[in-house]
Swiss-Prot record:
Superkingdom of the organism of origin: Archaea
Molecular function GO labels: ATP binding; ATP hydrolysis activity; ATP-dependent protein folding chaperone; unfolded protein binding
Keywords: ATP-binding, Chaperone, Nucleotide-binding
UniProt xrefs under InterPro entries: Chaperone_TCP-1, Chaperonin_TCP-1_CS, Cpn60/GroEL/TCP-1, GroEL-like_apical_dom_sf, GROEL-like_equatorial_sf, TCP-1-like_intermed_sf, TCP-1_chaperonin, thermosome_alpha
Organism ancestry: Archaea, Methanobacteriati, Methanobacteriota, Thermococci, Thermococcales
Segments of this protein annotated with the region Disordered: 529-549
The protein, known as: Thermosome subunit alpha
Residue spans crossing the bilayer: none
SUPFAM superfamilies, per the entry: GroEL apical domain-like (SSF52029), GroEL equatorial domain-like (SSF48592), GroEL-intermediate domain like (SSF54849)
Family to which this protein belongs: Belongs to the TCP-1 chaperonin family.
Amino acid sequence: MAQLSGQPVVILPEGTQRYVGRDAQRLNILAARIIAETVRTTLGPKGMDKMLVDSLGDIVVTNDGATILDKIDLQHPAAKMMVEVAKTQDKEAGDGTTTAVVIAGELLRKAEELLDQNIHPSIIIKGYALAAEKAQEILEEIAIKVNPDDEETLLRIAMTSITGKNAESHKELLAKLAVDAVKQVAEKKDGKYVVDLDNIKFEKKAGEGVEESELVRGVVIDKEVVHPRMPKRVEGAKIALINEALEVKKTETDAKINITSPDQLMSFLEQEEKMLKDMVDHIAQTGANVVFVQKGIDDLAQHYLAKYGIMAVRRVKKSDMEKLAKATGAKIVTNVKDLTPEDLGYAEIVEERKLAGENMIFVEGCKNPKAVTILIRGGTEHVIDEVERALEDAVKVVKDVMEDGAVLPAGGAPEIELAISVDEYAKQVGGKEALAIENFADALKIIPKTLAENAGLDTVEILVKVISEHKNKGLGIGIDVFAGEPADMLERGIIAPLRVTKQAIKSARAAIMILRIDDVIAAKVSKPEGRQGAECPPNGCMGGMDMRM
């Protein structure tokens, strides 16, 4: 409601809440910081886990920042913006989601301190933008170039990523699986590696131990052979990929046939049978002995395929068909009549095997396959889910290094270097923007501070010590949380991709976006019956938008 010439003017519907200026900024900063604090305790090798229980009672126990934020039910728009930070980090770099969110939350906390000193948001925004740009330049300067073909470096990168996750006890095996998988699907274009992670499939089966997980240089499909008389194992497989049904096609128009005698019925059925037999005959003539079909296979077609000794699998997912094409060199055909011997792929073995009481098809021994499968085993569903999350992060960071050929020391070392260098840069800029740049630099110390805090170390003592040694001994000095002391991360093989840290610093954009908001208009949201939200923060909730998690 507003007033003009003493007359009240109703603009917004009843129940709408509006927050303007400092109130809007504080409320948004509070919501974003709550998200950052939620995941902060999971950061680093000594980070804690979160137990997430959904409305159906299903439980997820993890310390993966992206998974936690994806599973939390959020209502506050500023909180959702922080989730977008994590999603972008995961998509662009594959790791460092918690780091990105924690940095964004700390930048907002430091911005609030400046707001309390009556520094205008525009000045803070400009200072943060200058600092973020400078930080990116510094990261490029301090990055260590590595050989993308150096397996030892790739293994160290993968192990650093897995360290601290629930699958850590098998990090050597999992790192090896991740590196081998990425190297197998990597392709060189214009002298640089390009890795399409869609060509790495994760297939999970509960049972056995994690140590039984393996890399299949081909494709594993959760299907079974369609007919009991078909072979269960084919060596020297010539593989046909068909994305149409091996069935008699129905006409597009509703036609009716009047059958007046048994002979006509027999003739009709014989024609159907001939059409199906012709399809199978054509497949056999091409030399194919294994057929994967994206759609259905008629019972009669199954019978004829079995007579020819051809293994057939039906209703294969489109994504699996594409991986089979990449692995075996086969071409996917849309019409059986168009199938030629040149369209067939090759694998040394195609076999149906029983795993955890279920049949699965293994396509192995492909010639230089550009699609592979990591078969994940583990005692329970929770275990294999955590192993899958660890492997997903590991393959992404290995991809980063193979494509960029650049790494940084981990253990908070790059953030300490940035904090020192950006603080020096603030002195060159001067003016009120320098205050924002100094606060930006100070905010970056939240990463080494949190690593120490989560390891149960004295944060003040270790932070002073590590910054001092970093200045004296070089940019490799970070915090070894296992030894509880400053150490050279490069010497200890604790490294991370340049891309992860660069993308995490870009989280400053989210902080800038939130600081730009000075007016929030929130419509009243009707809450479903029987659903209770968490209590509002001291500053209140936004127009029916609770802080549910």
